[in-house]
Structures are given as C-alpha cells and as structure tokens.
C-alpha cells in the first residue's frame, strides 16, 4: 500500500509499505529517500507519536494515510567554559539586606534610594 509522509518544509514523500511493516522500517525507508537518520525522526499520526517497535496496523494506518515527520530536538549540554561564565555572571553578586537589590560583586553601598544607600550587603547565596 502507499502512504504519504509530510515534512516540516511542506514536502510530501510517497512510500510503498505493508500494514505489517514496523515504524522502524518506515523510518529506514525515509532515510533511503531523504537521508535523515532514523534516530532523528519522529513520526506523528492522528496526533500521536509512533513508537519504533509497533506496526502500521497497530496505529490503524491504512492506504493513502498521511504521517507527519518531525525532527527530534536534541537537548544540549553547555560547554564548561560558558557554564562557568554564566555562573560567574549570575551568582557572584552582592545583595542588599534591606531592599534585596542585586549589586556587582565589589559593591560597598546599595544603589537604591529606598534603603538609604545602606552598606548592609551580603554575598548572593550559591545554588545547590
């Protein structure tokens, strides 16, 4: 039977499959046509993400059904030097004990008028 796979760019791919084919097989056919690795593919049908081990029949996918292909988003790890820079920028601050203003690390007095430019400052608490 013939099914259609619609990509995010709007391109429609036609695939020749059997209802007993697994989702993994369909992803392999998409890789052959488009060059997208199966581990980066997510197939959606009727609002549900299709799992690799299941077959097309399990999802009631019939001839001329349209699947939607979405690329998997990879979570990122921040490079250690950038992570240290972000931590320095966000955590190394002084806090006013009266008005809780965040101040630069070498501050001696608060910059706000509301607390009378007090010199009662403390270091910002570190995240755990």
From Swiss-Prot:
SMART domains for this protein: Ribosomal_L40e, UBQ
SUPFAM superfamilies from the UniProt entry: Ubiquitin-like
Molecular function via GO: mRNA binding; structural constituent of ribosome
Domain of life of the source: Eukaryota
Glycyl lysine isopeptide (Gly-Lys) (interchain with K-? in acceptor proteins) cross-link, renumbered residues: 76
UniProt xrefs under InterPro entries: Ribosomal_eL40_dom, Ribosomal_eL40_sf, Ubiquitin-like_dom, Ubiquitin-like_domsf, Ubiquitin_CS, Ubiquitin_dom, Ubiquitin_ubiquitin-like
GO cellular component: cytoplasm; nucleus; ribonucleoprotein complex; ribosome
GO biological process, one term: translation
Protein keywords: Cytoplasm, Isopeptide bond, Nucleus, Ribonucleoprotein, Ribosomal protein, Ubl conjugation
Location in chain, cross-link Glycyl lysine isopeptide (Lys-Gly) (interchain with G-Cter in ubiquitin): 48
Residues in Ubiquitin-like domain copies: 1-76
Entry's family note: In the N-terminal section; belongs to the ubiquitin family. In the C-terminal section; belongs to the eukaryotic ribosomal protein eL40 family.
PANTHER family: UBIQUITIN (PTHR10666)
Protein name (record): Ubiquitin-ribosomal protein eL40y fusion protein
Native source species: Chlamydomonas reinhardtii
Gene that encodes it: UBI3
């Amino acid at each position: 039977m013939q099914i259609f796979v619609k990509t995010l760019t709007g391109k429609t791919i036609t695939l020749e499959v059997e209802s007993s084919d697994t989702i993994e097989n369909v992803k392999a056919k998409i890789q052959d046509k488009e060059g997208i690795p199966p581990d980066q593919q997510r197939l959606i049908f009727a609002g549900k993400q299709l799992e690799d081990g299941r077959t097309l029949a399990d999802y009631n996918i019939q001839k001329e059904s349209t699947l939607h292909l979405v690329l998997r988003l990879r979570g990122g790890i921040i490079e250690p030097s950038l992570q240290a820079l972000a931590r320095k920028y966000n955590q190394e601050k002084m806090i006013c004990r009266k008005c809780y203003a965040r101040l630069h690390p070498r501050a001696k007095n608060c910059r706000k008028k509301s607390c009378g430019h007090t010199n009662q400052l403390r270091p910002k608490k570190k995240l755990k």
